[in-house]
Amino acid sequence: MEDRSEEGGDHSEMPSAPSTPPSKRKSKFAGFGKFFKPWKWRKRKSSDSFRETSEVLERKISTRKPREELIKRGLLVEVPEEDGSIPSESPPLRNGHMSVEPANPPEDSGGLKRKTRPDSTGPRPKSGETTVQPCATAEVAPLEPHATAEVSPVQPQASAEVTPVQPLPVSEVAPMQPLPVNEVAPMQPLPVNEVAPKQPHHVSEVASVVSRPTSEVAPVQKVSRDFSKQPLLPPKRPLSISTSVTQESAVAGQKSDSSNRLQSSAPVPTPRTIHPPASSKQPPVPPPKPQNRNSNPLMAELSLALAGSPLSPAGSRPSPPLPPKRAMPPSTDAVTNKENALGPASLPPTPANEIITPSPPSPPASSHIPVSNPPVPPLTLAPPYTEVEKEQSASPIPLHIRIQQALNSPQPLPLLDSSQRAQSLLFMQNDMGPSEEGTRVRSLPVTIELLKVPDDEDDESLEDESLSPESSESHTSKVYIGDVPSVTVIPSYLPTCVQEEEEGGVSDTDSEGPVLYRDDEEEEEEEETSALANKVKRKDTLAMKLSGRMASEDSNSEFPQRSREEWNQIRQDIGTQLNRRLSQRPTAEELEQRNILQKNEADRLAEKKEIKRRLTRKLSQRPTVAELVERKILRFNEYVEATDAHDYDRRADKPWTRLTPADKAAIRKELNEFKSTEMAVHAESKHFTRFHRP
């Protein structure tokens, strides 16, 4: 019994443990304790566990997360004995190139074994591959500085471990004292933000020391293959074209320029650049469009190459042999500027070898300008008279006479046949001046049609071109033919496709030179703008508007003076038309009757007062019942009797207002009988007189 009582006591105590003691249940706020106490207990417990787990997680993150992430990415290989991490495989570089292949793997792996711990069990395949990588980079460095400058920013986290593995080659390339392994990587592993800042030091020193001699260029096929593998990220210009590389390449380009210009049959020298030539597998890359065509320093090379191959516009006819061209000698400043433009490090990234891919050898007549030119007589505006006289003798009518006739006659002359066409030469002026050998100069043949009488619009465009001194000096050559004082302005052929945009007559596909790639959208925009400019030049829209305005003002001022009677007639017609329309309108009374026109408020009040006054007057004059009986107006006074009736609710259910069906039948019968007796009808139609259904 005691055991049961003890067990019962235990059972009674167990459920009462979580609840409050019975003394507290008597208080007012016992219910609040039930609600809030478990909530407080849970919050306190959860905060303790959260703090413990957060500490554990922070400890794990600070120690292991960087290494795990790097191992997952493939940047590190886990070494259990040593704290330093070794890169596992060579990832693609940031600028889109692959790293260089190892030169001799057996020596590198052996050298790595000597540097690392002696108790490590054999080289792993991955670690062998990755540790060979820095050795190969350091050994190939004097031969391929391009690859060295790109390999140096590869491993942002593993740069601290790469340095002690190969102290000798890196110290040869960059004067930098390597640290031992225990100083670089202590036993406590460092997070990412502490290891990473060491990396730009290597890149800057390696990139600043490394220079690229032009005679020791690495094989370009490997780099071009890496280009085709990863074309997503373009190479960064400060890495691929460093200042030292461009300086040495510019010096070599100047030397080859000066040597090739003296030789007439040599091809056009192109400055040496990092970009690989297009291989047989890859299609030729279209060059980007230059920013400013006139001021580009590489346009000189293009213009010289274009001068070599004779370009003829579309539809040009064959011309007689070319006379020697007299041109201004190129100033020494222009020559020095041209050579200096190829040299400095701010070279635009569109070299001439991309713009001129074929680069045909120029004939002896179009050889390059020697650096020291003998002085040439100044430019004369008229061609030799011998050629002009030959052409005039070929046609029956002399050319200057036809020009005088064309200028004097107001109508254009009819076109003659091909035998009477005057063919002349257009002498080309390049920005760099003519290329001479002896006294003969090769220029572009252009046929000139017969001169017509220019319209006013053409005169304006010619005056604009002749008045501007810069355009007349640089782009035009004035030709005086015979004794005529009139000036024919002929625009010269500009280098590249600038004139094609302005004229719109010569297309890129018709020219024999290299195809100059242009974006279609930009070409359309240029055509639109040039067309708009030509339209504005041709048509003076302001004068047309002003003339039209003056004509309209004159017509307005002359009209009333000229036709007063007609104006009066028009006014009368309008008046009669308005009167007819007004007569067809409904009147105000009709609109009021149709409730369309609302009456005025004052009129409505006055009308109500009038109605009230009339009614009161009639009621006041109304005779009484006695007067009507006396005047014998009321003759049925014997059965008319007036009784005072009490007001009652007829809607109420009263017994005297309730009719039974028998009462209703009796009423109907009485009415039918009354009607049949009151009306004298035929016997056959008597049933029509029934008032109610019986």
From Swiss-Prot:
A molecular function (GO) term: actin binding
Composition bias type Low complexity, residue spans: 300-317
Protein species of origin: Xenopus laevis
Lineage start: Eukaryota, Metazoa, Chordata, Craniata, Vertebrata
PROSITE patterns listed in its UniProt record: RPEL
UniProt RPEL repeat ranges: 55-80, 576-601, 613-638
Composition-biased stretches (Acidic residues): 455-467, 499-511, 519-529
GO BP terms, alphabetized: actin cytoskeleton organization; closure of optic fissure; enteric nervous system development; negative regulation of integrin-mediated signaling pathway; neural crest cell migration; neural tube closure; positive regulation of catalytic activity; regulation of cell cycle
Region span, Disordered: 1-29, 42-169, 192-403, 426-445, 450-572
Encoding gene (name): phactr4-a
Superkingdom of origin organism: Eukaryota
Protein name as annotated: Phosphatase and actin regulator 4-A
Purpose: Regulator of protein phosphatase 1 (PP1) required for neural tube and optic fissure closure, and enteric neural crest cell (ENCCs) migration during development. Acts as an activator of PP1. During neural tube closure, localizes to the ventral neural tube and activates PP1, leading to down-regulate cell proliferation within cranial neural tissue and the neural retina. Also acts as a regulator of migration of enteric neural crest cells (ENCCs) by activating PP1, leading to repression of the integrin signaling through the rho/rock pathway.
UniProt subcellular location: Cytoplasm; Cell projection, Lamellipodium
Biased composition (Polar residues): 240-267
Keyword Repeat found: yes
Entry GO CC: cytoplasm; lamellipodium
